Amino acid sequence: MSKMNAFYAQSGGVTAVINASACGVIETCRRHKDKIGKVFAGQNGIIGALTEDLIDTNKESKSTIAALRHTPSGAFGSCRFKLKSLEDNKREYQRLIEVFKAHNIGYFFYNGGGDSADTCLKISQIGKTLCYPITAVHIPKTV
């Protein structure tokens, strides 16, 4: 089985610690090269996945990623975009799966508040409904 790539994005109002969380996700994924290939960051949250505006964080040096710990604001941009239900907008979910397949994404890390947790739940559910294996993880944006 080939290694799957990861998708990471920031959502909602950015906080003082959101980039530290990004650093943690990216560094942890890099430590597990046997399981995770690249880490793509979505430009402006989930919108980056829908528009296929992905940042290959593997092109960034170890020191650049480490600097995220002390970088204010949201390094990759954020959004307050809420996914509708699968019944209300199946095309949106099909588009996400298309992008995930195109980039071999099997891990979805979404950094934000309550709406972001809801997005992770929906991604997990559509993975099952649309038969695409994906692990969705919500990362809280506050301490």
Question: Language-model segments: what does each one mean?
Answer:
Residues 1-4, 9, 37, 66-68, ...:
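N-terminal low-complexity/intrinsically disordered extensions
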Residues 2-54:
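N-terminal phosphate-binding or glycine-rich loops at protein starts, especially the Walker A/P-loop
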Residues 5-15, 75-80, 106-112:
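Short glycine-rich or small-residue beta-strand-to-loop segments that form or flank ligand, phosphate
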Residues 9, 42, 110-111, 137-139:
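Structural motif
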Residues 18-21, 50-55, 87-88, 118-124:
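Short acidic, glycine/serine/threonine-rich loops at helix termini
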Residues 52-106, 115-116, 139, 143:
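Glycine-rich oxoanion-binding loops at beta->alpha junctions
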Residues 124-143:
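Short, acidic/small-residue loops that bind anionic groups at enzyme active sites
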